[in-house]
Amino acid sequence: MPPAMSLVIKNLHARVKDGAPILNGINLEIPKGEVHAIMGPNGSGKSTLSKVLCGHPDYEVTGGSVSLDGQDLLAMSVDERSRAGLFLAFQYPVEVPGVTNANFMRAAMQARLPKGEDVDAVSFYKELRGRMKQLGMDTKFTARAVNEGFSGGEKK
């Protein structure tokens, strides 16, 4: 299981690139191991906050700070943020024909390794099958293409 993370947002201000301010003084602290839900009415900034944290190019941070496990999140590239474990899960995930769930997960693990290191295929599949057995999941899910033939909940 990946290590728990802490997220600290202090007085975060952001705007749409070349546009109007959209986040004004957001403060939030999520300690390691806690799970929080960001809730609010349409237009309150939930998606914008998520996109700003992930480094979406349509938004510009104009003030404040954000740290993830003590590291300056705003100084990280989009790629570094994803490798640190920050990502968006879409409400309606797209299907990716031709890419199996197993290959997708292996590629995700590979992306987190230092350059030149490889995920050993035999070890990976052995570990994957073991984890799926622990969770009571049918291993046939690994052979399906990403999100193909899954219910909405399974996709997420």
Task: Show where each model-derived region lies.
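ABC-family P-loop ATPase nucleotide-binding domains
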Residues: 94-156
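The feature captures the beta-strand-to-loop junction immediately N-terminal to the Walker
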Residues: 39-41
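Walker A/P-loop
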Residues: 47
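ABC ATPase NBD Q-loop/coupling interface
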Residues: 65-81, 147
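Conserved structural motif at the start of ABC-family nucleotide-binding domains
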Residues: 7-9, 23-25
